[in-house]
UniProtKB/Swiss-Prot annotation:
The lineage of its organism: Eukaryota, Viridiplantae, Streptophyta, Embryophyta, Tracheophyta. This is Small ribosomal subunit protein uS3c. Residues 43-121 form the KH type-2 domain. Part of the 30S ribosomal subunit. GO terms for cellular component: chloroplast; cytosolic small ribosomal subunit. It is found in: Plastid, Chloroplast. GO terms for molecular function: rRNA binding; structural constituent of ribosome. The gene is rps3. GO terms for biological process: translation. It comes from Jasminum nudiflorum (Winter jasmine).
Length: 221
C-alpha cells in the first residue's frame, strides 16, 4: 500500500531548504527547536495584533520565518507577501518595537538580536498565504467551492505551473465529514528535483475544525 510523504521533507536539501540554521550539541537540540517555534509563534501573534498589513484580502501574509544562530547573534528573517503599513519610517519603528519585545520575552542579554523583513515577489505562489486567503473566505461565509476556485485563480495569475487545493472536515456544516479537492495543471509529486511547495493549515469554523492542504508546482527554468 502506498504511503504519503510530506513534500517538503521529501525534497529537503534539493529544492527545499531549512528554516532553522544553527549547530547545537545533541542534548540541547530539542531545546533549540522549541525556542525557534516559540519565536515564530511570538512574531506571528505580535504582527497580527500590532501591525497593519497592506492586503485587501485581510491576509496576515507571513510566508516563512528563517532563524540563523551563532554564538553571539540571532538573526531572524521574516518573509512576507504584503508590505507592513505604507511608510518605511513606521516600519522601522515597528521592527524596533518587535525586537525589544523579543529580547524581553526570551531574555536575550548576552546575544545580539537582528530582525529583517523581506518581501516575496509573488505572494500567491506561496501555499501558506493562499491557505490564509481561503480561511478568510470561509470565515466570511463564502461557498467553499467558490473560495477554492478563487484561490486557484490567484495562484494561476502568479505564474504557477500546477496547484491542488484540498479541504477536509464538516464542510458547509454537514453532519458527516468529507474531503473535497480541486486540481489544475501539472503536479509531479514523485519527482524530487521539481519545485513543489506545500502547506497544511487548520481553520476553526462555527461547525468545527477544517483542514486545508495546498500543493503548488513552480517550474523554475
Amino acid at each position: 500500500m502506498g504511503q504519503k510523504i510530506n513534500p517538503l521533507g521529501f525534497r529537503l536539501g534539493t529544492t527545499q531548504g531549512h528554516h532553522s540554521l544553527w549547530i547545537s550539541q545533541p542534548k540541547n537540540y530539542s531545546k533549540g527547536l522549541k525556542e525557534d517555534q516559540n519565536i515564530r509563534d511570538f512574531i506571528q501573534n505580535y504582527i497580527q495584533k500590532n501591525m497593519r498589513i497592506s492586503s485587501r484580502d485581510r491576509v496576515e501574509g507571513i510566508a516563512r520565518i528563517e532563524i540563523k544562530k551563532t554564538i553571539d547573534l540571532i538573526q531572524i528573517i521574516i518573509f512576507m507577501g504584503f508590505p507592513i503599513e505604507n511608510r518605511p519610517r513606521k516600519v522601522k519603528e515597528k521592527i524596533k518595537e518587535l525586537q525589544i519585545h523579543l529580547e524581553k520575552e526570551f531574555h536575550y542579554v548576552k546575544k545580539k538580536l537582528k530582525i529583517a523583513i523581506t518581501k516575496i515577489a509573488k505572494p500567491y505562489q506561496n501555499p501558506k498565504i493562499l491557505a490564509e486567503f481561503l480561511a478568510g473566505q470561509l470565515k466570511d461565509r463564502v461557498s467553499f467551492r467558490k473560495a477554492m476556485k478563487k484561490a486557484i485563480e490567484l495562484a494561476e495569475q502568479a505564474d504557477t505551473e500546477g496547484i491542488r487545493v484540498q479541504m477536509a472536515g464538516r464542510i458547509n456544516g454537514k453532519d458527516i465529514a468529507r474531503v473535497e479537492w480541486i486540481r489544475r495543471g501539472r503536479l509531479p509529486l514523485q519527482t524530487i528535483r521539481t519545485k513543489i511547495d506545500y502547506c497544511c493549515y487548520t481553520i476553526r469554523t462555527i461547525y468545527g475544525v477544517l483542514g486545508i492542504k495546498i500543493w503548488i508546482f513552480i517550474d523554475e527554468k
